[in-house]
């Protein structure tokens, strides 16, 4: 049935959390036939978010949908080590209330950070926030945007407009990191499936500083 790139959303002493979205043949097969079985996994490949880059700073995380998965580790780390930074805010967006991932985590994280949890649309009577993640960028409570750090993960258009909003708020390009989700195959930079310009997402990324990443949006 082939292979599929999967986001690592958590690591423990003897386990790894994977966030799998059912979107095609391979992931559909995992959901249908292999519950409780052992599957072959290779990797991890590429880079990740280094928490040292965000220590002693105000940090803003903007994530859309399954884009929350790769930033879950950063949020979890600073929720347990709040003294290592100057303040943290997360804006997380989902299509609908039923699509919200990691609900238990959000309840814990909001104890140590400002949390904007929003959905694109909801039925009448929904009491949470409704709107795109960019709607809440003007509401960020920051002491100094020019020294704050930001992580943005999600679909290309969402990342493009989120970064635009951050720059308008006074963030510097060198203080913004983006992560690209692009179809990967070999994982070692040989097949070219994930090539954007002269970069290979599986080798050079998927995390890029925006000074590099701004030239890679496709």
What residues fall within each predicted segment?
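Ferredoxin-reductase
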Residues: 1-37, 94-95, 121
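Reductase modules of NAD(P)H-dependent flavoproteins
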Residues: 96-218
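Phosphate- and divalent-cation-binding pockets in alpha/beta enzyme and binding domains
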Residues: 29, 70-73, 101, 161-162
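Residues at the starts of beta-strands that form the adenosine-phosphate
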Residues: 38, 57-58, 84-89, 114, ...
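A short, hydrophobic beta-strand micro-motif
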Residues: 37-44
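Short, structured patches in soluble enzyme cores that scaffold and shape functional sites
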Residues: 43, 63, 90-95, 117-119
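A short, basic/flexible loop-to-alpha-helix module at the beginning of a structural domain
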Residues: 44-54
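Histidine-anchored nucleotide/phosphate-binding helix
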Residues: 70-82
């Amino acid at each position: 049935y082939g292979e599929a790139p999967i986001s690592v959303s958590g690591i423990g002493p003897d386990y790894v959390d994977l966030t799998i979205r059912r979107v095609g043949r391979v992931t559909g097969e995992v959901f249908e036939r292999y519950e409780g079985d052992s599957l072959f996994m290779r990797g991890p490949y590429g880079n990740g978010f280094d928490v040292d880059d965000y220590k002693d700073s105000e940090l803003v995380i903007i994530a859309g949908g399954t884009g929350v998965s790769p930033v879950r580790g950063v949020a979890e780390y600073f929720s347990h080590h709040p003294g290592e930074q100057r303040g943290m805010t997360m804006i997380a967006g989902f299509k609908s209330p039923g699509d919200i991932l990691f609900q238990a985590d959000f309840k814990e994280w909001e104890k140590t950070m400002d949390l904007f949890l929003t959905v694109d649309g909801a039925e009448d009577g929904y009491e949470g926030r409704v709107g795109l993640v960019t709607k809440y960028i003007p509401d960020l409570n920051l002491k100094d945007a020019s020294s704050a750090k930001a992580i943005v993960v999600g679909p290309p258009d969402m990342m493009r407009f989120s970064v635009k909003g951050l720059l308008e708020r006074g963030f510097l390009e060198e203080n913004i990191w983006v992560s690209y989700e692009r179809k990967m195959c070999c994982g070692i930079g040989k097949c070219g499936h994930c090539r954007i310009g002269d970069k290979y997402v599986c080798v050079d990324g998927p995390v890029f500083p925006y000074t590099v990443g701004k030239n890679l949006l496709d």
